Each structure stands twice: as C-alpha cells, then as structure tokens.
Amino acid sequence: MNSSNIKSSNDGCGISTAEDFIAFTYLINGEAYADRCLEEFGTSVNEKMTYYLLNDIHFTPEECARLQSIGHYNQSGFENSGFIDCLDGQNHTLYELKLEPKSNMDSYALFSFVDTAGIIKDLNIENVSYSNAGYTCKYEAILTGRNNGTITGCHIKGNNSFTGESVKQAGGIAGINKGCVINCSAENIDFQLPKAQASGISFSNFGQLLNCYMASCDFTNTLSSGGICYTMEPRSEMKNCYTYKTIGYPSKKKYGSLVYKSNNCTIESGLYCDVDVRGVYDTYQTTPKQIYTYDENTMTAENDIPVIDILNNWISDNAQLYPEKIFYQWIKGDIPPIILELR
C-alpha cells in the first residue's frame, strides 16, 4: 500500500472522527477521498508509518456503509495489496460498526488483508454487527480476514453478532492467521451461521496464537466450532490461552472449548471451564500439554491453583523464548474475571 509523502514528525496527527476513519480506509487503499491525505493521520516511527486513533468513535449505519475494507488479497498472487503499516488504536474503541462484504472476495473484515509487515495494536471494537447478504468469501472475520502480520492488544467487546447464510468459515479476530495474534480477546459474539464453522479468535491458524482469551461467545447455530481456534495447521502454535463460559455449543457438541481440530501443531497452556465438552475436540499428530479445566466460580484449576497464576507464570517461564514479543499481563476483571493489561 502506498504510504509515501507522510510527515515524519509527531505533530498530533491521527484519526479523530468517523469521517476521518472513512477517509483513511480509502486513502490507505490507494484511492482518493475528497481533498484528504494520509499525512493527516500518521507519522513515521522508527522508519515505519504509524497511524493513530485519537478518540473513541461511534459509527452510524450510513457511515458504516461508506467504509472500505482495508487491503485486498488475490489467491493468484497478482494485485495483492495488504496493510503494511501500523495502526495504533491507543486503547480507543470503534463502536457500532456494521460490516458487510459488497462483492465476492478471498477474505473480508475491517482489515481484509494485513501483510507480513503490518501491525494492528491496542484497538477495541464494541457492539459490532457482521452480516453477509450472499457473497462468497473464503475467510470472514470482524478485525482481519487474512493476517500475515501482527495483531496485538486488540479486543472485541460488548454485544456482537455474526450472521450470514453464505458464510462458511468465520473468526472473531482473524479468519486465517499466518502471522501472530497475541494479547487479544473476543467476547460475546453470537454466531448465527447455520452453514459455517466458527471460532472466537482465529478460524484457521498457520502461525502463532499467544496469550489470548475467548469469553461468553455463542456457537449454538454453527455446524462445529472452536473457542480459540477452529483448525490448527501443521507447525502452528497456540499457547497460554483460556476460554470462559461458552454460551452455547453446536449440535452433538461438535465443539472444542480451545480448539476444534489440530494437525501436527503445538498446543500448550490452555484453560477452559466448559467441563461437558473437550478442550481439543480432534487431535492428529498433536499432543496438547498443560491443558487444565477450572472452576468458573472459584477461578481455580487443579490443586486449587488460581487460573491467573497459571497464565502469568507461563509468561514468566516462557517469554524469553519470544524476545521480539511483548506479553501483556493477566489481571483480575469483572466479567470475564481475568483480562489482559499492558504493564
């Protein structure tokens, strides 16, 4: 994506309004938008363009209809245009987004394609409505359809819905992840997808899912689902994740509270309280380790060890294996009772 001619000094640039965000989605895709320019929204930080969200933003349905999905992926490899910069949400929230694909495409979300160098950090999305009127998309999600980059500190909160008769593969944070999703969460997503499989964090994972959680999502009206991830592909990782109180399962309990299907991957340090289903529904050439069930009332696992201690102790013991990553700490919350915070 074209991010040339951007100021390199930090002069208060950023995205403040819904109109700003709409303009940003056009400009970052290389399209003109009135007399606006990308230099209004970003600065160069360590030779990388960073765009800032300066406020919480509430969207109207009319404003949502004018948004462009950021990035485009073509399976042929031609005309790919992924997000390669950094969007720093600064812990602000986008409210009342309505996401709807407008054509057949490989992947669709707020960011359809985040490429290898791309970063989305510290962004909250609350009360989002995702619907598909009949278009064919291979991967669909709320935040990023196809992630090859880094998603960190991003959270889906509030009351959220995901609907569409044509949807086949759906995720909360990502549709397919080939990069790293770390320190992220998905809460209260009602997946009304009778012909689809779904997951709270990432539908398909070829990369890393680290230090994430899913809370109170409803998968009742799906074919089969996984709380954190639907399918873990060969050599992928899911580590130090937990799920809290799944609202409903697909028929015949075709549900893994952490993962639905795993194939020659690493699953380590996972906790769940849905005791009437499996943590990992189906394993192939995979031996999950340090998988715990816990009591949702006391938030303790085996031998009365607090869940929060298991999660934070894993970081203390293993963060040095990921020197380029920043792990947010687990702290006590309300609902869900354990959340993430950068300290």
Please provide the spans of the model-predicted regions.
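Surface-exposed repetitive/solenoidal architectures
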Residues: 1-343
